[in-house]
A protein has these predicted regions:
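Active-site environment of divalent metal-dependent phosphoester hydrolases
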Residues: 70, 168-174, 193-194, 245-249, ...
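Active-site beta-strand termini and strand-to-loop segments that position acidic
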Residues: 99-103, 232-233, 252-256
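Active-site neighborhood of phospho(di)ester-bond hydrolases with catalytic His/Asp-centered motifs
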Residues: 108-110, 159-167, 187-188, 240-243, ...
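Cap/insert and terminal regions of metallo-dependent hydrolase folds
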Residues: 129-154, 256-316
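Active-site metal-binding motif and surrounding structural segment of the metallo-beta-lactamase
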Residues: 125-186
């Protein structure tokens, strides 16, 4: 455990130095031209009413590859429950959720991996800084042929109009190069930070349609935090869940079988059930992560009929 406590700060330093080097060598990261996402008035103002009115919307979860690591490294290092966490390397799924709406068509939540992870294992299309970060933490990635995002979408005959991101970490954005130039990318307003761009900006090369969700004026819908009715019809909700990153988003799909996608507000079931928040960039982020996690846990207790899919564990 002592070695791990040393390695992670060192890896974070490597990531920061790598990001700065890339910034200087490449003349700076291109600035995303970001348009505020047009948020319509909500169809409902409480979750009882939302869930009492399921919508004609469907979802399918896809695994686009596997991340093998000590999953406990993703969690609050100061938590006393770390001693109970199984630190043996395990497989975490790189998940994408395909959602179909009768009016707004097909879209994704997160982008997973493109086929570079099968062609160039174990780091695929990650930046040099992220490859060093993975190596320092003993993280490897793998993918079976045909498991990549583009291959699965082709088999499903799906052409997504947009991707809604839980957050800007590369294991959630590495499938973006496989998507068309006209695809829209939607994320929390604070996600386009320097460090986020350092980790993922290469994935968005040639893309131009960026939209940010601003939760500052969104109503809190107890027991969750600020929540946005994305299409204004009660079918698809973006829920502010910061901590792991500054503007992490969870999503609720209000289908006949409703599902809450926690994103990396909770990476896997043990952490959710044990009340251990994800690690943030700093202690303040981790503290915010506990607030978000407890809101999600309270929602799960209040609405046990809602299926929970974690950031890297879906039971598929």
């Amino acid at each position: 455990m002592k070695l791990k406590k040393i390695l992670l700060p060192a890896a974070l330093l490597i990531l920061a130095i790598g990001a700065l080097a890339a910034y200087l060598v490449r003349g700076g990261f291109r600035q995303f031209e970001i348009t505020p996402y047009p948020v319509p008035p909500p169809a409902f103002t409480n979750w009882n009413d939302v869930l009492a009115h399921p919508r004609d919307i469907s979802w399918t979860t896809l695994r686009t590859g596997v991340i093998r690591m000590d999953a406990c490294l993703n969690l609050d290092p100061a938590s006393p429950r770390q001693a109970d966490c199984d630190h043996a390397p395990r497989d975490l799924a790189a998940l994408v959720h395909w959602v179909h709406h009768p009016r707004f068509g097909d879209f994704l939540v997160d982008a997973g991996f493109d086929d570079s992870f099968a062609k160039h294992p174990p780091y695929g299309n990650y930046t040099e800084a992220m490859q060093l970060f993975n190596w320092a933490n003993g993280v490897t990635n793998r993918q079976e042929p045909g498991e990549d995002l583009a291959a699965q979408l082709a088999r499903l005959h799906v052409h997504p109009n947009a991707v809604f991101f839980t957050h800007f970490h590369p294991d959630h954005t590495a499938g973006v190069p496989a998507l068309g130039r006209e695809t829209e990318f939607v994320f929390g307003k604070a996600e386009a930070s320097f460090l986020a761009r350092a980790a993922v900006s290469g994935h968005f090369s040639g893309k131009s349609k960026f939209f940010s969700i601003d939760f500052s004026a969104a109503p809190a819908m107890a027991p969750l935090g600020p929540s946005v009715d994305v299409f204004g019809d009660g079918s698809f909700w973006a829920i502010s869940a910061p901590g792991h990153t500054d503007d992490d988003i969870a999503f609720l799909i209000n289908a006949t079988t409703p599902v809450l996608l926690t994103g990396d507000a909770s990476h896997f079931a043990w952490a959710f059930q044990s009340g251990v928040a994800p690690r943030g960039w700093n202690s303040a982020g981790t503290a915010r992560g506990y607030v978000s996690l407890e809101q999600l846990r309270a929602f799960a207790r209040a609405y046990p009929s809602v299926k929970i899919i974690y950031g890297h564990e879906a039971g598929i």
